[in-house]
């Protein structure tokens, strides 16, 4: 089993990844500044939890030297698109400079054998078909721009140091313990608060939603392959759902109808109508298959105890 360090391991996707790896017997440590994450979500004891900010280069290096990981999975980032658009300097500082510090620390600690860097489908341009990893990039928001820079940094680092590097382009994650008000947790919050008239933004965009448990399994499967060089993979489910489809899934699990009212304040000025992953490369490389569908995921979310 590997010694693993997850940056952002107390966040939404990072905590699911940590739980998955810990259950598989990997030796886990977490670095997180808890600006969005929550300490209780990180499945590690206090001596393996490091309260640190990736913008602090020396702090990152201290943690890396203390933990001597085999694998580093870099998930720490600001990723809520409206927040990034409103705070572009902060987004760039964390997502770009923070990544530089993590990569530099990996290069200075000889134990590190593989690096996984979380990116996003937001690096792609607006298109109407499924996208594979060979498609040209063309982000249309601050988040995507910072993550494309992250990818370039990771690739340059891998070429310069010879470090095996995996770049994972995450599509739309859903699951328990969400820490940002994306679509599914926002519907969940309103429904659990007793609302049957939902206030949402644009109803027509379609997204490829993938459960965080499936994402965690995909990341582990990629690292277990022992990939050499620098490789990029889409991490999605390969099925797209509209906002209306998501609301319908909640209706099925509730057994009652929901009404939707469009809130103009929630409508994005620049909106992708489609975002769908071609995950052929991921499946071909690892044999991975997603296990969670929308209905199963929504059923568990309705049983979740969330702050309203």
Task: Give the positions of each predicted feature.
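C-terminal substrate-binding subdomain of Rossmann-fold SDR/epimerase-dehydratase oxidoreductases
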Residues: 192-308
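N-terminal Rossmann-like NAD(P)+-binding domain of SDR-like oxidoreductases, especially those catalyzing
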Residues: 1-173
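NAD(P)-dependent short-chain dehydrogenase/reductase
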Residues: 129-130, 142, 148, 152-208, ...
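A structural alpha-helix within SAM-dependent methyltransferase catalytic domains
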Residues: 22, 64, 103-107, 155, ...
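Residues that form or immediately flank small-molecule/cofactor binding pockets and catalytic motifs
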Residues: 54, 136, 175, 205, ...
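Generic structural signal for helix capping and beta-alpha/helix-loop junctions
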Residues: 38, 81, 125, 175, ...
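Residues in well-ordered alpha-helical elements
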Residues: 58, 70, 82, 89, ...
